[in-house]
Amino acid sequence: MKRSLSGIQPSGILHIGNYFGAMKQFVDLQDSYDGFYFIADYHSLTSLTKAETLKENTYNIVLDYLAVGLDPSKSTIFLQSNVPEHTELTWLLSNITPVGLLERGHSYKDKIAKGIPSNTGLLTYPVLMAADILIYDSDVVPVGKDQKQHLEMTRDIAMKFNQQYGVEFFKLPEPLILDDSAIVPGTDGQKMSKSYNNTINMFATKKKLKEQVMSIVTDSTPLEEPKNPDNNIAKIYALFNNIDKQNELKDKFLAGNFGYGHAKTELLNSILEYFGTAREKREELEKNMDYVKDVLNEGSKKARTIAIEKIKKAKEIVGLVGNIY
């Protein structure tokens, strides 16, 4: 079975855009791939500076993924910082990675353009990411179409290492393009993102979830008049309902005497119904945090066993003789 690997940054609360853009597909993939999913807490240090927030987010993400169906008996769920070999391999790869390659990274340039202070962690982020992927001999990496450059950089770094040392040591991972054709709109119409503060969080309290749904921006068409059925409410509603339900909502918009508030209520009910089982499961998991921590610890032990063997061989290839683990 081919190995699939993906990292999830604990940089904030997950939302329905994350779910349909990645989480749901990770769950669907776990029956056909040997899935490795890690909490990328080292990576999050490039943007998170509050220790308590990082700790809280880390466990929240594990809770979210377990609640939506990621199964520890099928997938390896682990914590990046529990496997120090990631950072050890990062140093080996840093010494064969051109600075120019890192400076050309889209993500790096975008963050600098947004005024995020440049630091070494931000610049060398792709090297750590390459180490994350290569240390497990990953066959595929699930990515969105706009993230392909990240994986291309990993492949470039792997090829550079292999060529420099005359070996075929690192496997060149292939992209597994996620179906992101239906980009989830946020409450303001832009792509749903924590950065835009326009998210709908599926595990929020019912009160908070209602506030988020009711904040969806609409036009000022009066209640009695027909409305454009191709609006943000309808687009989000389509994620949770079949075509018949979607057409019913469309007909209501076109008929008039159906307000955006009515549509938002229907959307809220759809979200609560769709995530009903997951919300209940998450509540139960929160009462058993020892289990959640055990999942992370056991997954980390399994991941580290693999990582140690890979780093031992990598150190031997470059001429380092220290191999005590």
UniProtKB/Swiss-Prot annotation:
One GO-annotated biological process of the protein: tryptophanyl-tRNA aminoacylation
GO CC, alphabetical: cytosol
Binding site for ATP: 9-11, 17-18, 144-146, 184, 191-195
Motif residue range(s): 'KMSKS' region: 191-195
Reactions accelerated catalytically: tRNA(Trp) + L-tryptophan + ATP = L-tryptophyl-tRNA(Trp) + AMP + diphosphate + H(+)
Enzyme Commission numbers on file: 6.1.1.2
Function noted in UniProt: Catalyzes the attachment of tryptophan to tRNA(Trp).
Name of the protein in its database record: Tryptophan--tRNA ligase
